[in-house]
């Protein structure tokens, strides 16, 4: 499956992807481990599709659990990471010459979009323990721009003005990794 010959719509149909609320992109939860006494799955995994369309990106957010990002197909992703210690990193996930997999540590602000010149990217994320909608914390762009001024333009581009900063729990299973 090549991004030059396969369309994002074909990818979404092939894998049964649906819109990912708040964060953005199309996704499907592919696995959730057995729940603990509090209802949290032992682990969880999702597939996500992002495209080069305006407004299609993984909005800046953070999670209380490490999240492993896996590149599957298509064009590379540009992943912005703003760490709790004040450091930051702009990472390329996927080919050519990018990371095929990357662990984003708990508490790190993260957001992603298809790298310039790309059409779409199919990737996955895995968490253990698994995702619950209450884990998702959307970014306050003004706060992050003040703390990371050199990335202000990227931060604003990876935030949706007026969007909720929490993830709805609409299906009882959670809506992410």
Model-derived segments and spans:
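Non-catalytic, conserved peripheral segments adjacent to functional cores
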Residues: 1-102, 111-112, 118-120, 125, ...
């Amino acid at each position: 499956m090549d991004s030059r010959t396969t369309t994002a719509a074909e990818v979404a149909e092939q894998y049964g992807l649906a819109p990912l609320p708040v964060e953005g992109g199309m996704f499907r939860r592919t696995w959730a481990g057995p729940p603990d006494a509090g209802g949290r799955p032992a682990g969880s995994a999702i597939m996500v599709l992002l495209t080069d369309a305006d407004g299609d990106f993984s909005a800046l957010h953070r999670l209380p659990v490490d999240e492993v990002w896996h590149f599957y197909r298509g064009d590379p992703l540009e992943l912005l990471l703003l760490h709790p210690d004040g450091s930051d990193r702009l990472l390329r996930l996927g080919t050519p010459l990018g990371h095929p997999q990357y662990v984003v540590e708990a508490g790190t602000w993260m957001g992603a979009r298809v790298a310039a010149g790309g059409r779409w990217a199919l990737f996955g994320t895995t968490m253990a323990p698994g995702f619950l909608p209450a884990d998702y914390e959307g970014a306050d762009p003004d706060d992050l721009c003040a703390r990371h001024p050199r990335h202000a333009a990227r931060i604003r581009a990876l935030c949706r003005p007026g969007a909720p900063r929490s993830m709805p729990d609409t299906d009882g299973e959670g809506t992410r990794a």
